[in-house]
């Protein structure tokens, strides 16, 4: 299983992740990205069909704000740093 979360402290609202994976990432009123699957808690497994899109977003994030892990983040984007 794969989980994802956005570090909203480092996100610069560039829009790259939503373009790469619109079924996973969206933006708040300030343009800051979040994971729509679980309101950016990193606790819902990303469906297999969306893994490639998620990895494209992860690799394309200029600030490394998108985090990906094999275990849930429990709301903490820095849990595995």
UniProtKB/Swiss-Prot annotation:
Q: Does the keyword Thylakoid apply?
A: no
Cofactor(s) in the UniProt record: [4Fe-4S] cluster
Question: Where does the 4Fe-4S ferredoxin-type domain start and stop, copy by copy?
Answer: 2-30
Q: Where does [4Fe-4S] cluster bind?
A: 11, 14, 17, 61
State which residue ranges cross the membrane.
Answer: none
The source's domain of life comes to Bacteria
Note on cofactor: Binds 1 [4Fe-4S] cluster.
Q: Does the keyword Ribosomal protein apply?
A: no
Query: Which InterPro entries does this UniProt record tie to the protein?
Result: 3Fe4S_ferredoxin, 4Fe4S_Fe-S-bd, ET_Ferredoxin
- What keywords would UniProt list here? 4Fe-4S, Electron transport, Iron, Iron-sulfur, Metal-binding, Repeat, Transport
GO terms for MF: 4 iron, 4 sulfur cluster binding; electron transfer activity; iron ion binding
Q: Quote the function comment for this protein.
A: Ferredoxins are iron-sulfur proteins that transfer electrons in a wide variety of metabolic reactions.
The identity of this protein, by name, is Ferredoxin
Q: What is the lineage of its organism?
A: Bacteria, Bacillati, Bacillota, Bacilli, Bacillales
């Amino acid at each position: 299983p794969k989980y994802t979360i956005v570090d909203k402290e480092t996100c610069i609202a560039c829009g790259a992740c939503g373009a790469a994976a619109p079924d996973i990432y969206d933006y708040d009123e300030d343009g800051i990205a979040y994971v729509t699957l679980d309101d950016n808690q990193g606790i819902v497994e990303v469906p297999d069909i969306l893994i490639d899109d998620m990895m494209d977003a992860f690799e394309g994030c200029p600030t490394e704000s998108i985090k990906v892990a094999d275990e849930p983040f429990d709301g903490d984007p820095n849990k595995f740093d």
